[in-house]
Amino acid sequence: MSKAWRLTPQAEQSLYEIAQWTFQTFGPRQADAYEQDILDRLDAIADGIAHNRSCQSLLDIKTERDVLYTHVGSHYLIYAEYDEHFVLLDVLHQRVDLPRRLAHIASKAKS
């Protein structure tokens, strides 16, 4: 059975900005295709078949809940899993300083 998922406000904002940039840069067809790629990866996470990695090895802090990431297109989907659902914490471009951004996200996920 697939897990339900939800987005944090930060994840919603990041997805909106990605959609806007992709639309303005590459047009509506590519924006729609990239949105579908992201939705497909979210479905794969929900079904437990996404290739993911723990962020713990990139962090100097311990978190109560493991923060995971998976790659789609030019972005990383950062999320936390729970028994019945997962929460998309943020979407980061592959060129960001991943350990620094993950530390910030993980510190917020502690609460």
What are these regions (language model features)?
Residues 29, 33-40, 52, 56, ...:
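Residue-level signal for alpha-helical context at structural boundaries
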Residues 1-6, 15, 37, 49, ...:
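Solvent-exposed, well-ordered amphipathic alpha-helical segments
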Residues 1-41:
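Arg/Lys-rich, positively charged N-terminal/basic patches that mediate binding to nucleic acids
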Residues 41-47:
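Short, basic alpha-helical nucleic acid-contact segments in DNA-binding proteins
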Residues 72-76, 80-111:
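Enriched for short, Lys/Arg-rich terminal
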Residues 48-86:
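Basic/aromatic recognition patch in beta-strand/loop cores that engages polyanionic ligands
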